[in-house]
From Swiss-Prot:
Name assigned to this protein: Venom protein Vn4.6
Tissue-specificity statement: Expressed by the venom gland.
Range of residues in the leader sequence: 1-23
Chain coiled-coil ranges: none
PTM comment text: Contains 2 disulfide bonds.
Organism of provenance: Cotesia rubecula (Cabbage white butterfly parasite)
GO cellular component: extracellular region
Cell membrane in keyword set: no
Amino acid sequence: MSKIILAIFLIVLCGLIFVTVDAMIDAPCKDNDDCDRFTEYCAIYADENGNEAGKRCEDAIGLLV
């Protein structure tokens, strides 16, 4: 019985970790510290006139591939 409870707890814990990390992608940011420090960076987006429209966290791993 305790092994089943432990297994359920570990599955839920792993799920929370992955959901929390993925939730930062496309989140608004002011600088790189607002994003996940190892896999994301704060990207600046511009409107059609070239003016800064905002900043969002982007996946840095995609830049390496």
